[in-house]
């Protein structure tokens, strides 16, 4: 077949280069919008269900987030929000937070957006810390420590900074970190025969956990919500156990320093009841019993509250 002459029509069934290019251009998918960490949104006429969903937002997902409730010039109530995510996300992923909201990539600094979203004073949510201008990673790590974040989180979010300045960040935490305890730590005792599931019950309890090993040191303690003292038979000094199970400020030793004890819950598992842990000739076991808030015992196939006949002294008073 002879080639087409310039200006002539292509053979039947063939498409000219120009026409093919036009078709490809028409059917080409629009480019995907680039992912970003910083977004702002507006949600008009928010429902109670949508407002309540803010309670499910996790601080671990954000460097900073703020949501304010406002009324527009036309009288339309709306939510005005800004998020600075830890991981870049595209618009479809953000729709999982608020499907009906109008989302745009944010302009200005975190502080600018903080002021804008809180201008009417009705702030429904704040998470994290707003980054200031062109703040360095070290400055952000320091701000995280000052805000009371756990050192494990600081190390995870600022790994390179932690490798370089970990000792300084830890020293800063010790100097200005956690506030002393001003609440009663809840004490849960679980007793029963070997293999009944005491350790599993403790491991399944919600919250971050620190397992206290036998010995003086609390190395690795970083203000976890729950402290587990597993398979206990009295190997902590009696006076130390009384202090950590109380409501007053107390510091525990780590190598080279002391840190505030601020855990909300202590779970003690043992094969023996609390009155068998220490000699009553030397220790006032009644003082320990009064600090116990809940005592569970194994009863054939489940854990139940210990009956009064097992309690040598009253608990939780």
Curated annotation (Swiss-Prot):
Superkingdom classification of source: Viruses
Swiss-Prot/TrEMBL catalytic activity: ATP + H2O = ADP + phosphate + H(+)
The record's note on its domains: There are 3 rolling circle replication (RCR) motifs. RCR-2 is probably involved in metal coordination. RCR-3 is required for phosphodiester bond cleavage for initiation of RCR.
Keyword field: ATP-binding, Covalent protein-DNA linkage, DNA replication, DNA-binding, Endonuclease, Helicase, Host nucleus, Hydrolase, Metal-binding, Multifunctional enzyme, Nuclease, Nucleotide-binding, Nucleotidyltransferase, Transferase
Chief location of this protein within or outside the cell: host cell
Known role: Essential for the replication of viral ssDNA. The closed circular ssDNA genome is first converted to a superhelical dsDNA. Rep and/or Rep' binds a specific hairpin at the genome origin of replication. Introduces an endonucleolytic nick within the conserved sequence 5'-AGTATTAC-3' in the intergenic region of the genome, thereby initiating the rolling circle replication (RCR). Following cleavage, binds covalently to the 5'-phosphate of DNA as a tyrosyl ester. The cleavage gives rise to a free 3'-OH that serves as a primer for the cellular DNA polymerase.
Annotated gene: rep
Originating species: Pigeon circovirus
InterPro entries: CRESS_DNA_REP (IPR049912), Helicase_SF3_ssDNA/RNA_vir (IPR000605), P-loop_NTPase (IPR027417)
Short motif (RCR-1): ranges: 40-43
Pfam families, per database record: RNA_helicase (PF00910), Viral_Rep (PF02407)
Subunit and partners: Interacts with the capsid protein; this interaction relocates Rep into the nucleus.
Descriptive protein name: Replication-associated protein
Gene Ontology CC: host cell nucleus
Location of region: Disordered: 1-34
